[in-house]
């Protein structure tokens, strides 16, 4: 029996009390779970409002049974109409679909995803079109069979570009090596990658940072038990 494990970690831009990056995890009506990540234009309260709007709408549509590509298009139309095409946002949806036994990924702008399959890590480039700005929009869709060892790592540009202003930027090769070395468990990878990105910004993040890790593993329990752990500093 396979098991889907998901971990997320995020922090705010230095000296900002609210993050413009939003993450949501929601169940799929036909079985499975989706991770939704949005990075809205700007930072602070206004960006937070817009990114929350995006992920909340996406989660609601997924719960109603909409397919991920249709979800991305509908959320785009909503943001475009509400903000008159003046506010952009990235949108990444990574879904473990138990009905099709596959991992489906929908991307609009933002950094590439990193996919670990068969012990090899590769990049999955996104479309360069964010949601909310252009009248028409098409997400990049990719699908992988659900198999043991498959892992998806998604992040916002606060992590992807960490260290750039200090002359210590990440390279894709460094990301790949880091993922291979720290993939188990997913919580550890999410936390250490966030910590390393913060360190590269000298403990003063230059942008909001968010990361998720979705991993397919083996479940060996007799009773299927779902668990969740959340830590939120007050």
Predicted regions and their residues:
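Intrinsically disordered, low-complexity terminal regulatory regions
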Residues: 1-12, 17-19, 27-30, 58, ...
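PP2C/PPM family metal-dependent serine/threonine protein phosphatase catalytic domain
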Residues: 2-21, 76-81, 111-147, 171, ...
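Acidic loop->beta-strand submotif enriched in PP2C/PPM serine/threonine phosphatases
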Residues: 16-33, 88-91, 124-171, 203
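Beta-strand scaffold of nucleotide-dependent catalytic cores
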Residues: 35-38, 104-108, 224-226
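DG-centered beta-turn motif at the end of beta-strands
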Residues: 39-40, 110, 155-159, 208
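Active-site-proximal, acidic helix/loop segment immediately C-terminal to a metal-coordinating Asp/Glu
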Residues: 42-64, 150-201, 226-229, 234
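Catalytic core of PPM/PP2C metal-dependent serine/threonine phosphatase domains
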Residues: 48-118, 125, 139, 190-215
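Activation on terminal intrinsically disordered regulatory regions flanking enzyme cores
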Residues: 204-234
């Amino acid at each position: 029996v396979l098991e889907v494990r998901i971990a997320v970690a995020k922090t705010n831009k230095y000296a900002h009390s609210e993050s413009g990056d939003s993450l949501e995890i929601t169940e799929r009506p036909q079985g499975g779970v989706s991770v939704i990540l949005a990075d809205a234009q700007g930072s602070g309260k206004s960006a937070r409002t817009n990114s929350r709007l995006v992920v909340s709408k996406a989660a609601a549509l997924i719960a109603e049974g909409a397919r991920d590509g249709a979800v991305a298009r509908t959320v785009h139309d909503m943001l475009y109409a509400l903000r008159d095409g003046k506010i952009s946002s990235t949108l990444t949806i990574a879904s473990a679909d138990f009905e099709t036994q596959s991992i489906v990924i929908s991307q609009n702008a933002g950094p590439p995803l990193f996919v670990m399959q068969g012990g090899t890590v590769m990049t999955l480039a996104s479309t360069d079109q964010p949601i909310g700005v252009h009248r028409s929009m098409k997400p990049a869709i990719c699908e992988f069979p659900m198999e043991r060892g498959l892992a998806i790592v998604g992040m916002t540009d606060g992590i992807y570009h960490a260290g750039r202003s200090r002359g210590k930027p990440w390279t894709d090769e460094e990301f790949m090596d880091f993922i291979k070395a720290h993939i188990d468990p997913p919580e550890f990878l999410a936390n250490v990658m966030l910590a390393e990105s913060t360190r590269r910004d000298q403990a003063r993040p230059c942008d909001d940072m968010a990361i998720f890790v979705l991993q397919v593993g083996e479940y060996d329990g007799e009773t299927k038990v779902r668990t969740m752990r959340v830590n939120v500093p007050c």
